[in-house]
Swiss-Prot record:
Name under which the protein is recorded: Histidinol-phosphate aminotransferase
Pathway(s) of this molecule: Amino-acid biosynthesis; L-histidine biosynthesis; L-histidine from 5-phospho-alpha-D-ribose 1-diphosphate: step 7/9
Molecular function (Gene Ontology), one example: pyridoxal phosphate binding
Organism taxonomic ancestry: Archaea, Methanobacteriati, Methanobacteriota, Thermococci, Thermococcales
Species: Pyrococcus furiosus (strain ATCC 43587 / DSM 3638 / JCM 8422 / Vc1)
UniProt family annotation: Belongs to the class-II pyridoxal-phosphate-dependent aminotransferase family. Histidinol-phosphate aminotransferase subfamily.
Amino acid sequence: MIWEEILNFEPYRAVEGNYRIWLDKNESPYDLPPQLKEEILEELKRIEFNRYPHITSDPLREALAEFYGLKKENIAVGNGSDELINYLVKMFKGKYIVVTSPTFGMYSFFAKLHGIPVKDIPLKEDFTIDGERIAEEGKAASAIFIASPNNPTGNSQPENEVLKVLDSGRVVILDEAYSEFSGKSFIPKISEYENLVILRTFSKAFGLAGIRCGYMIANEKIIDALYRILPPYNLNSLTMTVAIKMLEHYDIVKRRIKLIVKERERIRREFIEYSYPSEANFLLMKLDAYDYLLKKGIVVRKLSGRLEGHIRVTIGKKWENDELIKALKEFLEECRCG
């Protein structure tokens, strides 16, 4: 009854259980302030729940357009960036998509789901892309996916290397899910490159992982094409209301970004020999401490393949980071003594 390919598909899994500290999903450690939640609840009371939301999510698209100084025709929104990636892998002409491992796994996930070949052009030793190689080997690509800052390594990609790929003329999907933490973005290049698509999310810096809201910025032709195949009413009224309210309170987001960056650098200083530079809300660490931390009630992300023996640690609240630092120091001490 069910296609064999689906039964053999490796699903996305996340650790569940009653653990003390969760530092595995790159979420913000901060919930919304109670006063802001009350403000949102007042807005939600005005929604007619018996009515469908706007068919193309225009209220949020217009709010984002104003936020970035763009037109709503340059913006599409979805149920997390994942929904948008699901369509982007199959929208453009070409023989395969390009990914640059180690990187976010959902690009390959959705491509394989739709039977689209994936060409992996690995990151260099320092986790940066080789723009010339990608441009050359990606000549027949339908889309080239680049994450900057990259997940799970945390580094931003050099602008000149990204430009080499853009100059190839192939469609470049630049995933900027963590760009608020780096302060770097290619959004100003949208008007210059018709082949540039930028992915963004409300899940990380905005602290809204629970509402599942992502968006993309691109030229009007690409956005128009996407809305021809997106399901109508794809984003619900509650999600749009919360996202719009957070754009109005971006001062809260900026303060929290500063706190997270400060904590990130504090942890990095403690483990400078074992951690890589990061411009995201997490650290890549060359420590095979996943099982040890789990026994201490701390969940981090265990990595594999090229990053076997590494962990990815989301930056938490100060007390959570204190517990992490303490546990990792104990781990290192046991390694030395053992």
